[in-house]
Amino acid sequence: TLNRNEDIATTGKRHAYSFDYKIGVDADGKILAYEVFLYQQAGAFADISPAVLGRSFLHTSGSYYIPNIKVSAVSCKTNIPPNNAFRGFGVPQGTFAIESAIHHIAEKMGVDASEIKFKNLLRDNDTLPYGMRLEKTNALRCWETLDKQVDIAKRIAMVKEYNTTNTKTKRGIAVIPVCFGI
């Protein structure tokens, strides 16, 4: 058996990713097009990396309707132990890419990211990038239920107010819809 130091030095971790993207939106914040290139850190050899990358690939649109999408990806061999499957199995990495893009859009437009997210949520009869038509989706209903229960805009305002009056500590808030599985 390995001691803890040997175990940490020789076993894989969650796959680290980098990504480059271009995203196009209209004046109202509706996403029109999204192009993303994912770089996956596989480690010394592939192991389970191709399957994890495949899941990331399928989840780069998150829970949003994006009419025009192009996804490219590469698994990079690096000088570390091979990475392994972890909870989420590539979905968090693909989701992180689109969520980051949405936050950048919101910042440039001077609105909260939750506004952009709500406008682009998957709705009944939307089609996913790989051709699956959603006859019925609960994304919008879940968002609206959450908003009724916690008043998203009010909580965001409370966080902003706290952050403007406190210099040493800050708070954050996020709402992230997750689409998992196909």
Tell where the protein language model's regions lie, with residue ranges.
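Predominant activation on well-ordered alpha-helical scaffold segments within soluble catalytic domains
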Residues: 1, 22, 67, 95, ...
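General beta-strand structural signal in soluble alpha/beta enzymes
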Residues: 1-2, 32-36, 118, 177
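Structured beta-strand/loop patches that form or line metal/cofactor-binding pockets in enzymes
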Residues: 2-19, 177, 181-182
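Flexible loop/turn segments at secondary-structure boundaries
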Residues: 6-10, 41-45, 123-128, 182
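Glycine-rich loop/linker segments at domain edges
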Residues: 16-101, 179-181
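Conserved active-site and cofactor/substrate-binding residues in soluble primary-metabolism enzymes
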Residues: 61, 93-100, 111, 134-141, ...
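Long hydrophobic segments that form regular secondary structure
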Residues: 85-126
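Accessory "access/gating" subregions that flank catalytic or transport cores
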Residues: 119-182
